[in-house]
Amino acid sequence: MDSREIHHQQQQQQQQQQQQQQQQQHLQQQQQPPPGMLMSHHNSYNRNPNAAAAVLMGHNTSTSQAMHQRLPFGGSMSPHQPQQHQYHHPQPQQQIDQKTLESLGFDGSPSSVAATQQHSMRFGIDHQQVKKKRGRPRKYAADGGGGGGGGSNIALGLAPTSPLPSASNSYGGGNEGGGGGDSAGANANSSDPPAKRNRGRPPGSGKKQLDALGGTGGVGFTPHVIEVKTGEDIATKILAFTNQGPRAICILSATGAVTNVMLRQANNSNPTGTVKYEGRFEIISLSGSFLNSESNGTVTKTGNLSVSLAGHEGRIVGGCVDGMLVAGSQVQVIVGSFVPDGRKQKQSAGRAQNTPEPASAPANMLSFGGVGGPGSPRSQGQQHSSESSEENESNSPLHRRSNNNNSNNHGIFGNSTPQPLHQIPMQMYQNLWPGNSPQ
């Protein structure tokens, strides 16, 4: 061979070596991942160990090729052997590296490098936030919410995270994908929790409804049963019951029959308005009330009784009781005692101490079965059974009380001026409540 040809071949080999070195440097730059990928995506390299091995093998082959080119030209190796080694091995190596980087979404552009760093930082933050606590999560959140979607996040201690953008938007779109994720997270955090709804009736609403009805509400309602035997005056028994304490009394119902009754029924034919009925009448209803009233320092009970009766022929009579109401059979009267106003009762507690009250009021209130004294209507009725009804009316305690007043007074159950109950002769009830002197 001529010296010119040898020199020309040497120049070609040098040019080929320079091109190979430039290609190797470019491949090394492409194979080197960005700093963010080294920090966060360490799992991706573990998933594809063949790619890492190929990168290391390519690096070693390139080093051996460089050392082989530095050997003297006159060696035993022919000049064509390095060229075959150079052109056959880097091609599969370059294809493997390119596929590995494409699988990671890295194309070597600056935008993809920035997107990869941003994605790696976000992935690291989300990995810290999604750390699950031990133990069973609470059923209800701290703010009282249910165990729904929002409550489960609060119970697990997880912040509402925005969904990660897709690989195409994250790597191809650059900062736009990250901005969309941040705006979604801001919208999720900006939503306020629902207001807690209180249960039950608002405080004070029940009292407002009672005040709207007018009047005062009673407290301490207690039911009682008064038993009246045949021949006794029902009205007198009720009056004796109301005189035993400061509580107000209301008559609820009664069962039984009556024989003699005086009712106030004013009409044109009877100006006085008092009518007497004799015979056997069944009690349909008995109602009334007795409340405390104070005048000139004296506390009295005022009220009236109303009764409806049914005769044997189906005739119904009724009106306000203005005299006697004699029982024709065993009669049971259901009454209730209550305190009209609790606040006023507390204020007048000192005054109520002067009024004696039985220690066991319900037991005494139910013991009305005793025999009356000499002045009871029953004994008087037996002694004067053959006399006229006018004499029986004059012997009734209620009628005697009305005779002591002026002629315009219609009795204790009328609408006349209230009189103290201690004016009624109560000697017949001394044996019923021992220890309580009649007032």
UniProtKB/Swiss-Prot annotation:
Protein's name according to its UniProt entry: AT-hook motif nuclear-localized protein 13
GO cellular component, one term: nucleus
PANTHER family linked: AT-HOOK MOTIF NUCLEAR-LOCALIZED PROTEIN 13, AT-HOOK MOTIF NUCLEAR-LOCALIZED PROTEIN 9
Domain-related comment: The PPC domain mediates interactions between AHL proteins.
Keyword vocabulary terms for this entry: DNA-binding, Nucleus, Repeat, Transcription, Transcription regulation
Keyword presence, RNA-binding: no
Highest taxon of the lineage: Eukaryota
Compositionally skewed regions (Gly residues) per UniProt: 143-152, 171-183
Residue ranges occupied by any PPC domain in the UniProt entry: 217-359
Polar residues composition-biased segments: 109-120, 347-357, 428-439
Low complexity biased stretches: 9-31, 79-95, 376-386, 403-416
Pfam families with a match to the protein in the record: PCC (PF03479)
Record InterPro entries: AHL, AT_hook_DNA-bd_motif, PPC_dom
Bipartite nuclear localization signal, short sequence motif: residues: 131-139
Role: Transcription factor that specifically binds AT-rich DNA sequences related to the nuclear matrix attachment regions (MARs).
Region (Disordered): 1-46, 69-216, 342-439
Organism, as annotated: Arabidopsis thaliana
Entry coiled-coil feature ranges: none
